[in-house]
């Protein structure tokens, strides 16, 4: 029998480690009285929304200003004394104590990277202390839904040094019977795509998220993806569809969108996206308009909301206040969930809960600067989100999440349900 005292936080340590781009990030370890330990590493984004929680960096010359030694110090000298003695089982109380200690609106005092590292490590320590896998600890007995992966196989925008304006072109293998088969389908298309790019004399180097980064236009990227799906032996729109992350805030200036040689106002931008949906089997569009273009977003939702999943990333930044504003204005129909946008596990779960209660889907997501940490894989199953975005089929920091989902599916056995097989993947008319 587990003694509740064994689950009390005893020690918290932190260190500066590296992410997949070679930039420093924060790792925390939470040790409990009974000897259980949880470790977590926070990710970092390249295309960050203006409304995200504050990621604390040191500045100065060290690591070209990107060091996180200050965040590490905050954990060991401020957060640890506050949390030691609390039960790791009370995640809400642990996170609330850190938010109170920080005292700012955007976690700029302690740093969202410091708070999140401890928040995630606490959950893992509690799970380990109880002898439970993380997805079961966070999700309870109903945590059995494996997500449809949105696989970013062509990278552009802020994630790659190429001519593509849109940031991500993704495969969505919703027609698979299981997660394992979905992963196989996506992998086969990924390798087929590489062959097609090679045959056309295009680059097969990869971007931050493991996808290819050829010099293509947005329409050309869609065309070669459909070609790859077909050549791999699958039916576009029936077995594998497409998803886009437009990341339009990155090319929005003075009220206009400049991409592919054109310059568009909000209504014209919506028209451009409508044309793409008509041309390709697209089931999901993320950040189709800029983060503060609320009127444009409303128009986009009116025109395409009944056909495809419209995901707010920079628009909502995993923030319940921003999400509620979107719900009140009938804006978008889905939220991208990035734990480091809001900076604590409790607030992340609150955003997912609000989305679900309001008829919005949730897509659990990585960041472009990732690590070997697999928390988001467990989180996607724990919350029954039904969708995960964790990059392409290369680079071990991406594949780590897919491999963890394979383990979870095996562990669940006959209880495992693949979201695509029960119609719980992205919305769409494909």
Curated annotation (Swiss-Prot):
Binding positions ((2R)-2-phosphoglycerate): 167, 338, 367-368, 389
Pfam family, one: Enolase_C
Transmembrane segment boundaries: none
Cofactor: Mg(2+)
Enzyme Commission numbers on file: 4.2.1.11
Pathway: Carbohydrate degradation; glycolysis; pyruvate from D-glyceraldehyde 3-phosphate: step 4/5
Manner of cofactor binding, per the entry note: Binds a second Mg(2+) ion via substrate during catalysis.
Protein name: Enolase
């Amino acid at each position: 029998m587990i003694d509740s005292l064994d689950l009390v936080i005893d020690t918290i340590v932190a260190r500066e480690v590296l992410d997949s781009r070679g930039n420093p990030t924060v790792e925390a370890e939470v040790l409990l009285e009974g000897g259980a330990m949880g470790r977590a590493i926070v990710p970092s984004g390249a295309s960050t929304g203006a409304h995200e929680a504050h990621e604390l960096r040191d500045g100065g010359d060290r690591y070209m200003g990107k060091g996180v030694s200050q965040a590490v110090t905050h954990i060991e000298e401020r957060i640890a004394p506050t949390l030691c003695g609390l039960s790791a089982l009370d995640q809400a109380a642990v996170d609330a104590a850190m938010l109170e200690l920080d005292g700012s609106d955007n976690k700029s005092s302690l740093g969202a990277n410091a708070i999140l590292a401890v928040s995630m490590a606490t959950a893992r320590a509690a799970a380990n202390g109880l002898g439970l896998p993380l997805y079961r600890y966070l999700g309870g007995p109903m945590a059995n839904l494996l997500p449809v992966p949105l696989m970013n196989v062509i990278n552009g925008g802020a994630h790659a040094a190429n001519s593509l304006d849109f940031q991500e072109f993704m495969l969505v293998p919703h027609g698979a019977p299981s997660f394992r088969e979905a992963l196989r389908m996506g992998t086969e298309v990924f390798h087929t795509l590489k062959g097609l790019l090679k045959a056309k004399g295009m680059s097969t180097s990869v971007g931050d998220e493991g996808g290819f980064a050829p010099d293509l236009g947005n329409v050309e990227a869609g065309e070669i993806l459909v070609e790859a799906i077909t050549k791999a032996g699958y039916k576009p729109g029936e077995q594998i569809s497409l998803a886009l992350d437009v990341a339009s805030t990155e090319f929005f200036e003075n009220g206009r969108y400049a991409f592919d040689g054109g310059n568009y106002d909000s209504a014209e931008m919506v028209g451009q996206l409508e044309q793409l949906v008509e041309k390709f089997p697209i089931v999901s569009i993320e950040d189709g308009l800029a983060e503060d273009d609320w009127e444009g977003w409303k128009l986009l939702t009116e025109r395409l909301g009944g056909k495809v999943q419209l995901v707010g990333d920079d628009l909502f930044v995993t923030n319940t206040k921003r999400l509620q504003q979107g719900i009140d204005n009938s804006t978008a129909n889905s939220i991208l969930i990035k734990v480091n946008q809001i900076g604590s596990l409790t607030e992340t779960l609150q955003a997912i809960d609000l989305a679900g209660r309001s008829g919005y889907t949730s897509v659990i997501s990585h960041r472009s600067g990732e690590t070997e940490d697999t928390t988001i894989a467990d989180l996607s199953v724990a919350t029954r989100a039904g969708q995960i975005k964790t990059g392409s089929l290369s680079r071990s920091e991406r594949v780590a999440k897919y491999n963890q989902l394979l383990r979870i599916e095996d562990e669940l056995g006959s209880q495992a349900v693949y979201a695509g097989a029960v119609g719980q993947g992205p919305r769409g008319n494909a």
